[in-house]
């Protein structure tokens, strides 16, 4: 019973950290990354469709993304959607390929992005702690039902705390990595 609670908590904590990593991967750094355009939606026959489903996106070099649209008639719509996004990018069309050069980040913009990433990290930590609280509540319910003793209750709460500390440490290391990436010129 307690092992099930611990395993469930670990799975949920891992999902919290993975969600955090997914969020920060979309934060623009100085490097070109196809995931940068993940949030862009194109109006395709009346439906908003993710750009990734309508085009092939590759990092041509460290500062340029190349987008090859599957349907040539969509190229102008893709350009407009990229310009309309809040990413501050200016795509240029060259035949069938749309190139998106990434301008270098200013110091002020880097600091703003670090604040955003830190806020995301705090949200991730809160999520992990909420999972810990839920797991501890389940263990306390078992104690209240007299399914387990106080020693086992204390031991399992310590295990859950160690698990929480380990996942928060992983989250913090991902944060430090992203901060270093953002400050890299």
UniProtKB/Swiss-Prot annotation:
It comes from the Bacteria. It is found in: Cytoplasm. Keywords: Cytoplasm, Protein biosynthesis. One of its GO terms (cellular component) is cytosol. Signal peptide: none annotated. GO terms for molecular function: ribosomal large subunit binding. SUPFAM superfamilies: Ribosome recycling factor, RRF (SSF55194). It holds the Pfam family RRF. The keyword Heme does not apply. InterPro entries: Ribosome_recyc_fac, Ribosome_recyc_fac_dom, RRF_sf. Transmembrane segments: none annotated. PANTHER family: MITOCHONDRIAL RIBOSOME RECYCLING FACTOR PSEUDO 1, RIBOSOME RECYCLING FACTOR. Responsible for the release of ribosomes from messenger RNA at the termination of protein biosynthesis. May increase the efficiency of translation by recycling ribosomes from one round of translation to another. NCBIfam families: frr. Belongs to the RRF family. This is Ribosome-recycling factor. The lineage of its organism: Bacteria, Pseudomonadati, Pseudomonadota, Gammaproteobacteria, Enterobacterales. The gene is frr.
